[in-house]
Amino acid sequence: MESQAPTLTPADIQRFERDGYLVVREAFPRADALAMQERWWSELAGTHGIRRDDRSTWRQIPGNLKAAKRDPAQAAILTGTVRGVFDDLLGAGSWSRPRDWGVTLVTFPEPGGWELPSRLWHWDNPCEPHLDRTRGLFVVSFIGPVAPRGGGTLILSGSPRLLIKQERRIPADQRRGLDGRTRERFYRSHPWLIALTGLAPSPADRIATFMDGETVVDGVPLRVVELTGEPGDMVFCHPVMVHCRAPNRGPRPRFMRIKQQFLTHEARTLLRGFLA
């Protein structure tokens, strides 16, 4: 049997290894994303009384959309392109079809200026299963259009490489997974990170300081990136990508999904051993 041609180029993989994320436009059909968006609006109306054509009903909802998370229509996300990305980044045969594509994120617009948050920066997975190579992904899917300042998740480009680098220096019997000490060590490892995460007074212009250019920390270039895209676009991130929720100052709600933990079979085995 002939081997499957790679979906990603060597430059794509190099970019992922450097920055910890890769944007893939039109990863699944726009029409399928828009069909899912219609179902989300139906659930918002039926469960929360929020109607698309009546902005007076728009408000933040508690939790996530429950029916949307289970919706069979999401099967359309696993296209040949998406399979190819998984194979190229994780290895063919190393992963299984996900049961779902993660949490359903809806953020309605609110008034005010757009500011870069200083709190709630975090990552969702421990470093341990990924110390020698990437064995999982943090996957973002765009169900609706998300423009700049429109509530798109903020990621810290380069952070997975820095976190893994720091974790490798710690003796195996002293690694603590996702506990508070691990997070605090990362946040306080450089003045730039201390200011980003609100542990020190912020610079006058947080956007310019943290988003307009890279700052090198321990040999790793870091920069805050706002995830924007069109329905059907996806972003494939390293599982220890540092990220943060962003305010929505745009004209429409943010509709995205995030699969926080998409792990290979090997990663699941390693994680069980680490947690035992």
Name the predicted role of every residue range.
Residues 116-121, 131, 148-158, 164-168, ...:
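A short secondary-structure junction signal
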Residues 126-148, 228-231, 260-263:
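Short, conserved beta-strand element in jelly-roll/cupin
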Residues 40-48, 90-94, 141, 147, ...:
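A generic secondary-structure signal for well-formed alpha-helical elements
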Residues 27, 100-102, 142, 158, ...:
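Short, well-ordered beta-to-alpha junction loops that form the rim of enzyme active sites
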Residues 24, 28, 231-234:
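Conserved beta-strand->loop/alpha-helix structural units within folded catalytic cores of enzymes
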Residues 105-112, 126, 143-148, 159-162:
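Short acidic/polar capping segments at secondary-structure boundaries
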Residues 46-52, 81, 165-171, 180-187, ...:
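Non-heme Fe(II)/2-oxoglutarate
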Residues 2-18, 25-130:
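Non-heme Fe(II)-dependent double-stranded beta-helix
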